[in-house]
């Protein structure tokens, strides 16, 4: 019954695909975070490898541009001793009109074991998961505006690392929430892990109308949104996904919602500042904050390797 309700889980409730944080039980999120904690030390070894995925083939399919996500997935799979194949979409048959499912079918014929997929269309990883063989696993590396589950998980790992638990935290998510798959994944993860107050902060034009239904507090001024916050997650303006005049200008946005050291004083003294990247300095966040003592943006990237190792190791170890 669990498998029918959630295509990410097998009949025993074990994770076989990671498509979205939404709908996953707290126990699975905790399992991933705990497993990631064990992998963090691998990054500090002289030989940065474990044999967990030896003999497995991992295909990275990035239909959208990426630096951090693609690179950390490649590093994670390599450190698990997998064979990693990065498909060059621009030079593949997909650029000649081959359908997504035909691409997957052909790669599956090459004995793929795991697909890491980033796609501009929401739901694309779900479609792939429905059409792969039972022994093949799918990880969503970002689909449209829908979800970015491994970013959400590495954000949770970062928060837990610095704040220990979620039970008394106030977390503010600031910026272009409307177009952000990261915001949605973070919100689902935070609520599942028991964070008592999640605030969504941004101009009305960049906050979805139904956001309050997700159990968050909507704030339309930065000052209200970050006052007393323990964690501030800044989001970039996704101009490539915008249509119409949602903002007067990036300069006006920075004036109202850009995080500066002066505004950061409104948060708790030990607040941490996060950002999923890429960062637009001087648009959503000032360079002094990015490079300041409360920024944990680079540790997020480091933790992302361990989290993605954990996800790949867990899904590859479970059968449909």
UniProtKB/Swiss-Prot annotation:
Record carries keyword Manganese: no
Q: What pathway is this protein a component of? A: Pyrimidine metabolism; UMP biosynthesis via de novo pathway; (S)-dihydroorotate from bicarbonate: step 2/3
Its family remark reads: Belongs to the aspartate/ornithine carbamoyltransferase superfamily. ATCase family.
UniProt: L-aspartate binding residues:
96, 181, 236
PROSITE patterns according to UniProt = CARBAMOYLTRANSFERASE
Provide one Gene Ontology cellular component: cytosol
SUPFAM superfamilies cross-referenced by the UniProt entry = Aspartate/ornithine carbamoyltransferase
Instruction: Please provide the Gene Ontology terms (biological process) for this protein.
Output: 'de novo' pyrimidine nucleobase biosynthetic process; 'de novo' UMP biosynthetic process; amino acid metabolic process
This chain's protein is named Aspartate carbamoyltransferase catalytic subunit
GO molecular-function annotation terms? Answer: amino acid binding; aspartate carbamoyltransferase activity
């Amino acid at each position: 019954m669990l498998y029918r309700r959630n295509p990410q889980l097998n009949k025993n409730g074990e994770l076989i695909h990671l498509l979205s944080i939404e709908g996953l039980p707290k126990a699975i999120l905790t399992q991933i975070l705990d497993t990631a904690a064990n992998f963090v030390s691998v990054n500090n070894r002289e030989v940065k490898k474990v044999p967990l995925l030896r003999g497995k083939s991992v295909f990275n399919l990035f239909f959208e541009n990426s630096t951090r996500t693609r690179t950390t997935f490649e590093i994670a799979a390599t450190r698990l001793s997998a064979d990693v194949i990065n498909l060059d979409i621009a030079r593949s048959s997909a650029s000649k009109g081959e359908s997504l499912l035909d691409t997957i079918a052909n790669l599956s014929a090459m004995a793929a074991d795991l697909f890491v997929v980033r796609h501009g269309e929401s739901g694309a990883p779900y479609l792939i998961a429905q059409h792969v063989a039972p022994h093949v696993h799918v990880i969503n590396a970002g689909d449209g505006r829908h979800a970015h589950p491994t970013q959400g998980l590495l954000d949770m790992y970062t928060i837990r690392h610095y704040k220990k638990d979620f039970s008394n935290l106030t977390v503010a998510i600031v910026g272009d929430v409307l177009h952000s798959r990261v915001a949605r994944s973070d919100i689902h993860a935070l609520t599942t892990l028991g964070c008592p107050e999640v605030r969504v902060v941004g101009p009305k034009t960049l906050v979805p109308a139904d956001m309050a239904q997700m159990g968050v507090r909507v704030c339309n001024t930065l000052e209200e949104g970050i006052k007393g916050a323990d964690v501030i997650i800044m989001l970039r303006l996704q101009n490539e996904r915008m249509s119409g005049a949602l903002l007067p200008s990036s300069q006006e946005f920075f004036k109202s919602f850009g995080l500066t050291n002066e505004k950061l004083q409104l948060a708790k003294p030990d607040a941490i500042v996060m950002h999923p990247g890429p960062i637009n300095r001087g648009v959503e966040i000032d360079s002094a904050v990015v490079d300041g003592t409360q920024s944990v943006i680079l540790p997020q990237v480091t933790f992302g390797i361990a989290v993605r190792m954990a996800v790949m190791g867990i899904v590859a170890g479970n059968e449909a």
